[in-house]
Amino acid sequence: MDADLYGYKWARDNVGQSGATIYRLYGKPDAPELFLKHGKGSVANDVTDEMVRLNWLTEFMPLPTIKHFIRTPDDAWLLTTAIPGKTAFQVLEEYPDSGENIVDALAVFLRRLHSIPVCNCPFNGDRVFRLAQAQSRMNNGLVGASDFDDERNGWPVEQVWKEMHKLLPFSPDSVVTHGDFSLDNLIFDEGKLIGCIDVGR
């Protein structure tokens, strides 16, 4: 990996809450911008999950290209190309009146993601799996009242859990999803949504 990193300037990327350490690599003549993501402990597993999902999903969607991946028992490093452009969040900040166009583009992109046949997806992120993850986090004291939106601000964790279960559909409609379909993970270039990042979930 050292040869791939030589000659770049480095800048820490503090966007997101994945727990991974992320660097943007830039400024190398005639070379693309890159991102280096490092995870330790359980976060190393998340970085590994992202590498595996990038490998699979690249057949269907525009994604960063994997340049290098290293895994040790306690660490993982993932080096990828950067998708040129700006995040949807950055576009909305720069052009506040573009909200309707951004929403339309997100809807088209999400439909494209949902159109991938579920039978082709080797990963399980269904509600049973996600609820088990959420319950484990609750049981380990990793969820607090400050994590909730304004409507549920100050609610006990157990109350939010019960209310959430009341909203679950009787029979789920399974589709391929992005585990963090947020404005910071969707990339626009020249007014078009051209790709997504952070596909570890």
What label would you give each PLM region?
Residues 21-26, 160-201:
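Active-site acidic catalytic loop and adjacent metal/ATP-binding pocket
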Residues 1-2, 115-179:
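An alpha-helical support segment within catalytic cores of ATP-dependent transferases
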Residues 12-123:
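ATP-binding pocket architecture of kinase catalytic cores
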Residues 14-21, 144-153, 199-201:
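Amphipathic, soluble alpha/beta structural segments
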Residues 7, 32-33, 60-63, 173, ...:
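A generic structural signal for alpha->beta connector loops
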Residues 36, 126, 197:
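Active-site donor/metal-binding and catalytic loop motifs
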